[in-house]
Amino acid sequence: MIQHTFTRTAASFSMLVLSASAMAEEVVDNPYGLSALWAQGDVVAKATLLILVIMSMGSWYVIFTKLLEQNRVMRYAQTAQSNFWNAGNVRQGADGLEEDSPFRFIAEKGLEGASKHTGLLGSINFNDWVTMSIQRAMNNVQSRMQDGLAVLATVGSTAPFVGLFGTVWGIYNALVKIGMSGQASIDKVAGPVGESLIMTAIGLAVAVPAVLGYNWLVRRNKVAMEEVHAFGADLHAVLLGSAESGAANK
C-alpha cells in the first residue's frame, strides 16, 4: 500500500515537472512581444516606437528638472523672507540674496527702475514706473518657470495618437502578411495583431505621466508665483516709502 502511494506521488511529481518545463519552454520560445515587434517591424513601426521613447524621455526630463527648479524657488523664497526684510535698505537686502535667486532679480530690477526715473521716463508717475519695473521682472520669472511645460502638454495630447497610428500601421501590415500567406487561423492573426496593439498601450503609458506631471507642475508653479507676487508687492511699497524719505539707495 505504501509503495503504491509512493509510486503515485512520484508519478504526479514527474508530471508537474514536465508541465513546468513545457511552460518554461513556451515562455522562452514565445515569438510575440516587444522584441518580436521590433525585430519584425518595418521602418515606420520602428520610427513610431522610437518617437514614443523620445517623447517619454523628454517628458520625464522636464518633470524632474522643473521639480528641482520649483524646489529652488521655494527655498529662495524662505531665504528672502528671513534675510531680505531685515536688511538696512533694498540694496543691502538684494546683495544678501543668492546670485541666481529670482527674488534678487526682482529687487535689482525694482532698484533699477527707481534709479532711472529720469529724462522722458521722469514724466511717468513714479508709482506707475516702479510698478511696471517690478511687474516686468515678475513676468520674466513666471515665463522662465513655465518653460518646458508646453512639452508635457504636447506629449500628453499627441502620444496616444502616435501610439494609435503605430497600431493601425501594424495591423495593416499584419493583415497584408496574413493575406499573402493565405492562412487566417487564430494563431496567425492573434500574434501580429496583439503586437500592434502594444503600440496603443505604449502611447498611453507615455501620455498619462506627461498629463499628470503637467497638472502637478502647474499647481506648484501657482504656489511659487504667489510667493513671487507677494514679494513684489512688498518691494513696491518699500521702494515708494524709501523714495519719499530719500533713502532708496543709501
Locate the predicted segments by residue.
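Predominantly long cytosolic amphipathic alpha-helical stalk/bundle segments
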Residues: 27, 71-186, 212-250
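Hydrophobic alpha-helical transmembrane segments
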Residues: 36-65
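Hydrophobic alpha-helical transmembrane segments of polytopic membrane proteins
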Residues: 196-212
